Amino acid sequence: MYKTVRSRFKVLITVIIIVLSLIAIKKLIVDPQPVRDIKMNTVYICGFWNRYPVRTQSRYYIEFKKDGTYVLMHDDSRRHQENYGEDGDGSRPEIEMFFGSYEIKNGNYVLTLTERTGVEFKDVKAVKNKKINFFYRNKYKNGGNMEAMVFLTRKGNYLFGYPDDTGKSYDERARYYWLFNKSDINKFPSSPEEFRKQFKMDKKAEQERLAEQNR
């Protein structure tokens, strides 16, 4: 009987070790991980605070290129319809893209803006149909100011956020987004023109937007 109990105990311990090992493997290999080493020409997804974004959350994406340029995307087109226009803020689904150059200072990536473009959708249904009611494109001849930048934290991971008073670290009181691997986007449009070609202009929705804007 003693041998039987001892044998069962060994089996139980083995099972526990296997389960814990599988959980550790999943966390390290399968689950998204915070970015600790930025690789060039790789798109990273940025989750609000320190969490990987769920399907219906707004998020940023960023890619640094070997030629000293970057592409940044803000995708706020994934929320449910009832989550737009909350408290009368007039928000609608939109996607913005930022193009520019970067400089590495003290391990941080300082961003300069050269071009910005974006689209707006009437509602969630329009997002699914890729029909927009507004498109804009702005160029910054002398380089625009990007207040936000990518910081290397004391923990050794990177995040997209706003500088504190020293300018060397991020402001923990402002919004910030951890960079994660496992991005659901692997390639950005190569230019604002290519970005615009992904969508169709909904003329009726555009007229409604202009009429509402002029009231």
Language-model region placement:
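Mid-length scaffold segments of soluble, non-membrane domains
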Residues: 100-104, 109
